[in-house]
Amino acid sequence: MSSETASLLNGKALAQKIQGELKTTVEKLQGNIGRPPGLAVIMVGDNPASAVYVRNKEKACAKVGIASFGRHLPTETPQEEVEALIHQLNADERVDGILVQLPLPPHLDTVKLLHAIAPEKDADGLHPMNLGHLIRGEEGLRSCTPWGVMRLLEEYNLDVAGKHAVVVGRSILVGKPLALMLLEKNATVSIAHSRTPDLGEITRQGDIIIAAVGKPNLITGEMVKPEAIAIDVGINRIMTKDGASKLVGDFEFNSVSQVSSYITPVPGGVGPMTVAMLLQNTVLSYQKH
């Protein structure tokens, strides 16, 4: 094991750089288009974590010059009413991007609501048409978190071509689209998940390991190949011994940072990149006007 610790992949700094670039783009385009870009975020219920995420997205929009059209609905709002709102926003010319904040209350059909968003306004990149474009290697709006991971690797000149990338997690939000993006850039990709026996045997093969499970400290230093790149998508709130709460990722940071060459911190790694890519998707839709 090296006595050196891993270099940090600073998602917060890169997100700020991207926001600055987007602000310049918006300022240039606004005169021609005659209005700012618009992002509508739909939140149903009062999930405290979701409320924080929505506020962060609105603040980021303001920095870039994107108009926010927040829609906060009561927990008991019926499916038909949420669908009707989405159709209304699809038709609203001021709105370039639509995002449904997840998770939704259990009585709502998440998949059906995501399908209701017009593909060209799908700011989260989760519509089946956009995921289909990704599978085919075609242009389309990309899923924000995986795209943020790829952009972070690119910023630090970490070429994935020919590397063995191990993705831990198979969700439609992160694991599956990220595996496809890595394939698109010529990585050899393995996907591990909750039913994978001996996870460490798989992760130790990875030149790049991306953890997106949501289990605190799941992957320890002994499960990581020396000099591997560790990308932590997990955001988990745990209680410390003194009773305070703390955010940690899916990697056990202290041990993994002693083995890996690069690692993303939690917070300040992938999280800010997700928001930056959401803004990027909104501006891309805006540019098509």
Curated annotation (Swiss-Prot):
Gene3D superfamilies on file = Leucine Dehydrogenase, chain A, domain 1, NAD(P)-binding Rossmann-like Domain
UniProt keyword terms in alphabetical order: Amino-acid biosynthesis, Histidine biosynthesis, Hydrolase, Methionine biosynthesis, Multifunctional enzyme, NADP, One-carbon metabolism, Oxidoreductase, Purine biosynthesis
InterPro entries assigned to the protein according to its UniProt record, in alphabetical order: Aminoacid_DH-like_N_sf (IPR046346), NAD(P)-bd_dom_sf (IPR036291), THF_DH/CycHdrlase (IPR000672), THF_DH/CycHdrlase_cat_dom (IPR020630), THF_DH/CycHdrlase_CS (IPR020867), THF_DH/CycHdrlase_NAD-bd_dom (IPR020631)
Q: Which GO terms describe its molecular function?
A: methenyltetrahydrofolate cyclohydrolase activity; methylenetetrahydrofolate dehydrogenase (NADP+) activity
GO BP terms: namely: L-histidine biosynthetic process; methionine biosynthetic process; purine nucleotide biosynthetic process; tetrahydrofolate interconversion
Which domain of life does the protein's organism represent? Answer: Bacteria
The record's Pfam families line, in alphabetical order, gives: THF_DHG_CYH, THF_DHG_CYH_C
Catalytic activity field: (6R)-5,10-methylene-5,6,7,8-tetrahydrofolate + NADP(+) = (6R)-5,10-methenyltetrahydrofolate + NADPH; (6R)-5,10-methenyltetrahydrofolate + H2O = (6R)-10-formyltetrahydrofolate + H(+)
What function does this protein fulfil?
A: Catalyzes the oxidation of 5,10-methylenetetrahydrofolate to 5,10-methenyltetrahydrofolate and then the hydrolysis of 5,10-methenyltetrahydrofolate to 10-formyltetrahydrofolate.
Q: What is this protein called?
A: Bifunctional protein FolD
Species name for this entry? Crocosphaera subtropica (strain ATCC 51142 / BH68)
Name the lineage. Bacteria, Bacillati, Cyanobacteriota, Cyanophyceae, Oscillatoriophycideae
Q: Which gene encodes it?
A: folD
